Structures are given as C-alpha cells and as structure tokens.
Amino acid sequence: MAVPARKTSKQKKRSRRGHIKLTTPAMHYDATTGEYRLSHRVSPKGFYKGRQVANENKQQNND
C-alpha cells in the first residue's frame, strides 16, 4: 500500500484546495408565475417550461 513519504504542509494542502468553493445556484425568472426559481426544476405552482405539469394543491408523502 502506498504511503506518503512526507507530511503535506498546510500551505500545499490549502493551495491545492483553493479552487474548491461553493457556487451560487442558477436562478431564473419564471414568466408564468412571476417568481424566481431554480433551473430545470418545477416551480412551486407546478409549472415547467410554461406548461402546468403538476397540481399545486397535490402533495406527495414519501413515507
């Protein structure tokens, strides 16, 4: 099994991880409902790409 010959320093470790960060979610304006929502998701009112694909009052329980 391979084992590192030397301990990785804090600077080396942190500089390697420097590009790893959180990104803001892609929000888009939904003209049908007049609200902002996440991309590629059904809106809370049940609309997707301008068409109603789910009922607003229907709630699913995954118990």
From Swiss-Prot:
Name the PANTHER family for this protein: 50S RIBOSOMAL PROTEIN L32, LARGE RIBOSOMAL SUBUNIT PROTEIN BL32
Q: Which GO terms are recorded in the biological process aspect for this UniProt protein?
A: translation
Q: Which NCBIfam families match?
A: rpmF_bact
Gene this protein is translated from: rpmF
Q: Sorted alphabetically, which keywords does the UniProt record give?
A: Ribonucleoprotein, Ribosomal protein
Query: Which HAMAP family does the record cross-reference, listed alphabetically?
Result: Ribosomal_bL32
Q: Which family does it belong to?
A: Belongs to the bacterial ribosomal protein bL32 family.
Q: Give the top-rank taxon of the lineage listed in the UniProt record for this protein.
A: Bacteria
Output this protein's name. Answer: Large ribosomal subunit protein bL32
Give the span(s) annotated as Disordered: 1-25, 42-63
UniProt entry tagged with the keyword Disulfide bond = no
Q: Which Pfam families match?
A: Ribosomal_L32p (PF01783)
Q: Which InterPro entries match?
A: Ribosomal_bL32, Ribosomal_bL32_bact, Ribosomal_zn-bd
GO CC term (a single one): large ribosomal subunit
Composition-biased stretches, type Polar residues, lie in 54-63
Q: Where is the composition biased (Basic residues)?
A: 7-20
Give the molecular function GO annotations: structural constituent of ribosome
